[in-house]
Regions:
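Flexible glycine-/small-residue-rich
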Residues: 37, 126, 276-278, 297
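C-terminal accessory "lid"/substrate-recognition subdomains
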Residues: 148-154, 158-288, 300-303, 307-311
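C-terminal engagement modules used by replication, chromatin/transcription, nuclear envelope/ESCRT
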Residues: 288-296
């Protein structure tokens, strides 16, 4: 059976960054790997960040999340059926940072997928700089996306103090308890180190972490009602201007509660990936991009966001 791994994590936690390393590690073991990338909204930005994996023999399939739950499940099921026919040994699924993991497990239980796929690892990425307070919906997603994880990786450890890392672990534990989930993570199940220092032994340990069956008390809400995305195409703004203005969005209540900003900008003939959360902004060179910026959050005011970006 094809092993299928799930990499979860809330918006901006660092799933795509880890996925690149994880998929490349499996390819380096001689395993035929395919990544199924699923982004929140109608434009799949994260897929562009994985282009370099193709040079390492990793294939990439995408699903855009700008649709209702039933349509999304049908699209995922169709993709998985197609991928099962192509001889992959391992499929790595990266859902959006706003994702009901029960939806994924329901799809895997469907025929004929239940005869072709076997759940391998569930890996949860949690930001070491996780905000102290989140909305009830965000707290639920944090918990539900981590409950089945065999391993939790803290991201941005190089930027966090020991107290902040411990705070992120405690926050996750509180979120799980609030959802009446019995899952508790022991010290050996949490990896809290700079990802630049991850060794081959670390990757091998993660690659066999497995999963734990757990359940959370369901919080019923429509992801697309609780969370929104605002798209800005062809803004024509410079990299310097965007890097100056994007951080202010996170503290401007008139914009709504901004959780993540991502997209691309061209500067001097070089494309850059912009990725921002309340913890900070990064700009990394990439081979190709497109003039798009996506803001994800709660109660967003698109007109106000555009005004702030262009000021």
């Amino acid at each position: 059976m094809v092993q299928v791994d799930l990499i979860t994590g809330f918006l901006g936690a660092g799933k795509t960054t880890f996925l690149r390393r994880y998929a490349a590690w499996w390819a380096g073991q001689g395993v035929k790997v395919c990544v199924l990338e699923n982004d929140f909204g109608a434009v799949n930005v994260d897929a562009m960040l994985l282009q370099d994996l193709e040079a390492q023999g990793v294939e990439l399939e995408t699903i855009s999340g700008g649709c209702d739950c039933d349509t999304h499940q049908r699209r995922m099921r169709t993709k998985l059926i197609s991928m099962a026919m192509r001889g992959f040994e391992r499929v790595i699924v990266e859902p959006s940072g706003i994702f009901d993991v029960d939806e994924f497990f329901d799809v895997l239980r469907d025929e004929p997928l239940d005869r072709w796929y076997q759940l391998g690892n569930v890996i949860a990425i949690v930001d070491a700089l996780l905000p102290e307070e989140l909305s009830p919906q965000a707290e639920y997603i944090l918990a539900s996306e981590s409950a089945w994880a065999g391993s939790v990786l803290l991201s941005r450890c190089q930027l966090a103090s020991d107290a902040q890392k411990q705070g992120a672990e405690a926050h996750l534990a509180r979120a799980l308890e609030a959802c009446k989930c019995s899952r508790k993570f022991g010290p050996k199940e949490i990896i809290a180190k700079d990802w630049a220092d991850l060794t081959g032994d670390d990757m091998a340990r993660i690659a066999k972490c497995g999963y734990r069956q757990a359940s959370c008390e369901k919080l019923h809400f429509e992801e697309h009602d609780a969370f929104a995305s605002a798209y800005f195409l062809e803004l024509g703004l410079s990299r310097a201007r965007l890097e100056r203005n994007i951080p202010s969005l996170f503290g401007d209540a008139a914009c709504g509660r901004v959780l993540r900003v991502k997209g691309f900008v061209e500067d001097g003939g070089q494309w850059y990936e912009l990725n921002a959360t309340a913890a900070g902004l990064t700009a990394a060179p990439i081979p190709q991009g497109q003039q798009v910026l996506i803001v994800i959050g709660e109660g967003l005011d698109k007109a106000r966001l555009e005004e702030e970006l262009k000021r």
